[in-house]
């Protein structure tokens, strides 16, 4: 769940899924509170898996309806919550690349002259992936 730090060929990466990081992603954070609350975890253990899967799907869809499309669209570089998270991390430590995927949007945002935030997008809608040679680039297939 927590982003992991990697040194690859002298470049420092912070890599993670990206869920729940930064000031946005309210729908995910709301859903996570429910699913990690001890009473609901206890209750969930007593449900038949078929019912548990249906409930999980129901709350996931309901969460998306509550959040609307705000969580699914690009908010601009100044409002993109994972970019804001990356900028905050840069105040603590230098990273060359931040790589996440939670937003499912292909994004490549230069944070400063030596740090870049890359959101990998997805292979279903955008056909995007990341490639690291001497630098990290977002590519399409």
Roles of regions detected by a PLM:
Residues 6-9, 106, 110-141:
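Binuclear metal-dependent phosphoesterase catalytic core
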Residues 21-23, 97-110, 126-127:
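Active-site environment of divalent metal-dependent phosphoester hydrolases
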Residues 1, 15-16, 97-102, 118-121:
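Active-site neighborhood of phospho(di)ester-bond hydrolases with catalytic His/Asp-centered motifs
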Residues 1-92:
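Conserved catalytic scaffold of divalent metal-dependent phosphoesterases
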Residues 11-13, 97, 140:
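Structural motif
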């Amino acid at each position: 769940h927590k982003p992991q730090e990697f040194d690859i060929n002298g470049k420092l990466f912070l890599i993670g899924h990206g869920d729940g990081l930064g000031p946005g992603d309210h729908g995910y954070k709301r859903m996570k509170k429910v699913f990690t609350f001890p009473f609901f975890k206890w209750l969930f253990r007593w449900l038949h898996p078929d019912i548990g899967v249906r409930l999980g799907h129901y709350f996931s869809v309901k969460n998306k309806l509550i959040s609307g499309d705000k969580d699914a669209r690009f908010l601009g570089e100044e409002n993109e919550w994972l970019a804001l998270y990356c900028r905050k991390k840069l105040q603590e430590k230098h990273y060359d690349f931040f790589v996440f995927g939670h937003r499912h949007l292909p994004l490549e945002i230069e944070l400063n002259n030596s740090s870049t935030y890359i959101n990998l997008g997805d292979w279903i809608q955008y056909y995007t992936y990341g490639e690291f040679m001497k630098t990290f680039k977002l590519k399409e297939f």
